Amino acid sequence: MSYNCCCGNFSSHSCEGYLCYSGYSRGGSSYPSNLVYSTEPLISQHLPAGFLSLQGLSGDLLGNP
């Protein structure tokens, strides 16, 4: 899985969890939205600006404005 190398770089559980869920979302919203809510505040503190774009994708999936 491609997210393993990313998570290895940051050694962050929030990074691993978020990227795993975001990967599933590409195949369809097959996961509860609360999983994104629980990880979203964490990744904003651990990931660089380049990865914050993933947060925007999660917002769209959740129907946030």
From Swiss-Prot:
Q: Which UniProt keywords apply?
A: Keratin, Repeat
InterPro entries associated with the record:
KRTAP_PMG (IPR007951)
Question: Record's superkingdom?
Answer: Eukaryota
Cellular component terms, GO, for this chain's entry? cytosol; intermediate filament
Cross-referenced Pfam families = PMG
**Subunit structure and binding partners:** Interacts with hair keratins.
Described purpose of this protein according to its UniProt entry: In the hair cortex, hair keratin intermediate filaments are embedded in an interfilamentous matrix, consisting of hair keratin-associated proteins (KRTAP), which are essential for the formation of a rigid and resistant hair shaft through their extensive disulfide bond cross-linking with abundant cysteine residues of hair keratins. The matrix proteins include the high-sulfur and high-glycine-tyrosine keratins.
Listed name of the protein: Keratin-associated protein 23-1
Gene that this sequence comes from: KRTAP23-1
